[in-house]
Amino acid sequence: MLTDRVLATKEALVVALGDNWERYRANMKNWFRSRWTKEEFDAESRKILTPDKLHLHNQFLLALLNKIDAFAPLENPPAVQTSSSSGNRSKRRKRSCRTFAERLNFELSDVLDFVAEDNMQIIRPPTTIGIPSDQQQQQLQSQRYCAQELFLPDAGFIMGRFLIGAWEIGLVSVDDNVAEYVAMAVQVLLKDLLSAIIKKRKHYKTSGEGNFYYDVGAPLRDPSLRNTVTRQKVDDTPLELDKELNTANFMRRQNDDVTFLSACEEVQPTERTVITLKDCQLALRDRNLIGSHAVYSINMERLNMMMH
């Protein structure tokens, strides 16, 4: 339903613009690439539209934004309190439901508050020429995108870019499942990249067939030490319990085990260091992480430029 609305308003706008449709689409790309603000895009669009055609621009923009917002998860409204005389049990039930709803509808904090000052210049949005600094600070909330917010793109974010790209190459529309699939693929790719970087730095264990890894950061055991207390013995005979548990020999054996375990522990704690660009470069030497050669070469060039 929303897709049909977008296509209908888009066709009406194309007919109204005529040859200016390419210019309108280029302006929209500048807005989506955060080169322009929404106000700048709206101002440039009004220059190529007559006053009697402005409503088509507003209808198309509203339909497109509704299409993108449809991918956002719905917020559960807080539970409405109703008068009832069922006693304390119903009151406890209402209180628990209200607490659960409040837990879902939490308020997000500003991510930039938790970023070090050294990295603020990297993630700050680009300044707009000709706009005072006070107005730029007011437009900061509307100019922040995935690179500035440090969040992964969601399906709605991807859907808007897909529609512009599809119209640019002559396609009619994009299926809704494509945006969700790409958003999930981005999450899996980022997970694989982070896992590869961490596994290059830390020891880890794998399952029997080597398909799954776990216990990342486990200390590497000294092969010269043989821990007979915690070592698993598969071929051992059944354990024979001592009938006299309160004897001095039993207590002395427990103390010996504690001393032996303390001797097998690490003498120096593991030093924790920050992940650097060199770690990323070493991890990306595995060509199976990024299958596309174009994406791999571009990002490796950027990584090398940041290191030098």
From Swiss-Prot:
It comes from the Eukaryota. This is Transcriptional adapter 1-1. GO terms for cellular component: nucleus; SAGA complex. Keywords: Nucleus, Transcription, Transcription regulation. It is found in: Nucleus. It holds the Pfam family SAGA-Tad1. The gene is Ada1-1. Component of the Spt-Ada-Gcn5 acetyltransferase (SAGA) complex consisting of wda/Taf5L, Saf6, Taf9, Taf10b, Taf12, Ada1, Spt3, Spt7, Spt20, Sf3b3, Sf3b5, Nipped-A/Tra1, a histone acetyltransferase (HAT) module made up of Gcn5, Ada2b (Isoform B), Ada3 and Sgf29, and a deubiquitinase (DUB) module made up of not/nonstop, Sgf11 and e(y)2 tethered to SAGA by Atxn7. Not a component of the Ada2a-containing ATAC complex. The keyword ATP-binding does not apply. One of a pair of almost identical proteins differing at a single amino acid position expressed from genes (Ada1-1 and Ada1-2) resulting from a gene duplication. InterPro entries: Hfi1/Tada1. One of its GO terms (molecular function) is transcription coactivator activity. CDD domains: HFD_TADA1. The keyword Transcription applies. Belongs to the TADA1 family. Component of the transcription regulatory complex SAGA, a multiprotein complex that activates transcription by remodeling chromatin and mediating histone acetylation and deubiquitination. The SAGA complex predominantly acetylates histone H3. One of its GO terms (biological process) is regulation of transcription by RNA polymerase II.
